[in-house]
Amino acid sequence: MGVYRIRVSTGDSVYAGSNNEVYLWLIGQHGEASLGKLFRPCRNSEAEFKVDVSEYLGPLLFVRVQKWHYLKEDAWFCNWISVKGPGDQGSEYTFPCYRWVQGTSILNLPEGTGCTVVEDSQGLFRNHREEELEERRSLYRWGNWKDGTILNVAATSISDLPVDQRFREDKRLEFEASQVLGTMDTVINFPKNTVTCWKSLDDFNYVFKSGHTKMAERVRNSWKEDAFFGYQFLNGANPMVLKRSTCLPARLVFPPGMEKLQAQLDEELKKGTLFEADFFLLDGIKANVILCSQQYLAAPLVMLKLQPDGQLLPIAIQLELPKTGSTPPPIFTPLDPPMDWLLAKCWVRSSDLQLHELQAHLLRGHLVAEVFAVATMRCLPSVHPVFKLLVPHLLYTMEINVRARSDLISERGFFDKVMSTGGGGHLDLLKQAGAFLTYSSLCPPDDLAERGLLDIDTCFYAKDALQLWQVMNRYVVGMFDLYYKTDQAVQDDYELQSWCQEITEIGLQGAQDRGFPTSLQSRAQACHFITMCIFTCTAQHSSIHLGQLDWFYWVPNAPCTMRLPPPKTKDATMEKLMATLPNPNQSTLQINVVWLLGRRQAVMVPLGQHSEEHFPNPEAKAVLKKFREELAALDKEIEIRNKSLDIPYEYLRPSLVENSVAI
């Protein structure tokens, strides 16, 4: 009983407002009241009004929302609704929404503090939780894009997605405008791309046009240098292949006359300074055929040594695995003729591009994040604190992945047109890479320890990833401790357990044999798992994504395809090198897609800076505030460090890390 002050916030995207009328009801623990027709929401605004309620409501639990139209449906994007009352001394309640209100269906928004099923001992939200999840499970269904790969949302086009998972208008316009620019550039450059082969490495400058970064310029000038080649395994676009050697790889069969190399490798191994990058996943993958022309793949092994000054130098490259009964493949070294050594390094760089895009970027970034997104929508109601914690980091992931499946890795998509793994090989590689997707590999403290990278002063990816993980983990623990006081509370939360099980057993297709948990038994284990989810959707994806425009724009440093087989003899010439590297048309397509995927986004939310307030309670706000302060401090620390580096490492600066997989 008394006067309630109502505030309603509408989103700022182009079509967030609505000409339709909005009706509201207040639902309290002891009663409910219809507020009637109140307003027509305007974009990027707050509506405020007071309503005299005659009923006694008690503590508020929900706001019920219904939009009504007479002639034309006009969707409304509601941010939140705030209610204070009764009277000026009454409590203030916030009801987060952050979704589209469509048609005339009724939407119940629970009060925003959030609670677990264990905390909801009176069952005040029980029916709402069950009804919301039932509706969500019908909207968000698992799909299987290709047999043998992890699951995805059941949507073959953007129109199949629930509207809340689609790009909002500003994001959509910016993304599609970039696609148009890339297509126009390909058409404009087509006449000069009709030649079948570049004549010299300098010819790649024809497609190295405006839009590149300062780092891409550095790559163009330094890509032949051995130290620069080795640096990329530590801090380049794909720092996920390198590991410290604990023994000489079994595949490393030395041809006659290479006893000195073997002795050198043994010596580096004893000192603990021997490292390897093994691209064995590419072995046996069928190479693409582009415009009736056979393309080629290799499965290189690179052996590198760590110098006292921190430089990582390549000392041996084997391009193919030995075959039983065949002559061992050649091992290339820096002592070989310069053209042979350069060609071998080009093969490694091409192989690294294939694994980067398919394993490190698509699988470990996009597809795994999509599993988290679908499972979260299916298993955690909006009132659940873990839903509130995760949902800002799942924004736009489903749509960007639908676009990837329809434009990039589909039949006649980008991979088929220009990548040596296209034409079906990319699907086989995804399946093989999925078999090596372990839980520990998604957790930097475990992954970096397993790969022996924690004590390398010049591995800035490792340093920044570990620090960022620790900041995220403290944030997750801070939020988690507000809602789970004991390990038993974790075990008794059947929604949380169902979510974890659905990720591991269904989305990741039985990943428990690769270390993923099917249940969460303690607060520490749950926080580790949730930190892994957030890190994967933010920092890990950005560490792989942000380097594309730097490292892949100069085509010889990351050839999208190779047009001659891997060399079996050491007799390379410039003509052979140029006949192997991508032709003009392939080069143009590569840099256009690299620009589209790797450019800095005009519509981008930095890590932790989401405007949505899913936790309106002061305790949770304090945890988020501390998280943002720690991110700002780490960002400043990295900025200061980078000033003293010859090559700044910025891919894990919190201000550049995107808050979700949205590109």
From Swiss-Prot:
Keyword annotations from UniProtKB, A to Z: Calcium, Cell membrane, Cytoplasm, Dioxygenase, Fatty acid metabolism, Iron, Lipid droplet, Lipid metabolism, Lipid-binding, Membrane, Metal-binding, Oxidoreductase
Pathway: Lipid metabolism; hydroperoxy eicosatetraenoic acid biosynthesis
Recorded phenotype for the gene knockout or disruption: Mice are fertile and do not display overt phenotype. However, reduced endoplasmic reticulum stress response to high-fat diet is observed. Aged mice also display systemic autoimmunity, a significant and spontaneous production of several forms of autoantibodies being detected and glomerulonephritis and deposits of complement and immunoglobulins within their glomeruli being observed. They also display reduced bone mass.
GO cellular component, one term: plasma membrane
Induction (record text): Up-regulated in response to endoplasmic reticulum stress (at protein level).
Name of one Pfam family that matches: PLAT
Tissues in which the protein is found: Found in pituitary and pineal glands as well as leukocytes, kidney, aorta, small intestine and cornea. Also expressed by resident peritoneal macrophages (at protein level).
SUPFAM superfamilies noted in UniProt: Lipase/lipooxygenase domain (PLAT/LH2 domain), Lipoxigenase
Keyword Transmembrane helix: no
Record domain PLAT: where: 2-115
InterPro entries, per the entry: LipOase (IPR000907), LipOase_C (IPR013819), LipOase_C_sf (IPR036226), LipOase_CS (IPR020834), LipOase_Fe_BS (IPR020833), LipOase_mml (IPR001885), PLAT/LH2_dom (IPR001024), PLAT/LH2_dom_sf (IPR036392)
Chain sites annotated for binding Fe cation: 361, 366, 541, 545, 663
Compartmental location: Cytoplasm, Cytosol; Cell membrane; Lipid droplet
Enzymatic reactions: (5Z,8Z,11Z,14Z)-eicosatetraenoate + O2 = (12S)-hydroperoxy-(5Z,8Z,10E,14Z)-eicosatetraenoate; (5Z,8Z,11Z,14Z)-eicosatetraenoate + O2 = (15S)-hydroperoxy-(5Z,8Z,11Z,13E)-eicosatetraenoate; (9Z,12Z)-octadecadienoate + O2 = (13S)-hydroperoxy-(9Z,11E)-octadecadienoate; (5Z,8Z,11Z,14Z)-eicosatetraenoate + 2 O2 = (14R,15S)-dihydroperoxy-(5Z,8Z,10E,12E)-eicosatetraenoate
UniProt xrefs under SMART domains: LH2
Residue span(s) of domain Lipoxygenase: 116-663
Membrane topology designation: Peripheral membrane protein
Protein family according to the UniProt entry: Belongs to the lipoxygenase family.
Subunit record text: Interacts with PEBP1; in response to IL13/interleukin-13, prevents the interaction of PEBP1 with RAF1 to activate the ERK signaling cascade.
Function according to Swiss-Prot or TrEMBL: Non-heme iron-containing dioxygenase that catalyzes the stereo-specific peroxidation of free and esterified polyunsaturated fatty acids generating a spectrum of bioactive lipid mediators. It inserts peroxyl groups at C12 or C15 of arachidonate ((5Z,8Z,11Z,14Z)-eicosatetraenoate) producing both 12-hydroperoxyeicosatetraenoate/12-HPETE and 15-hydroperoxyeicosatetraenoate/15-HPETE. It may then act on 12-HPETE to produce hepoxilins, which may show pro-inflammatory properties. Can also peroxidize linoleate ((9Z,12Z)-octadecadienoate) to 13-hydroperoxyoctadecadienoate.
Protein name (Swiss-Prot/TrEMBL): Polyunsaturated fatty acid lipoxygenase ALOX15
Gene designation: Alox15
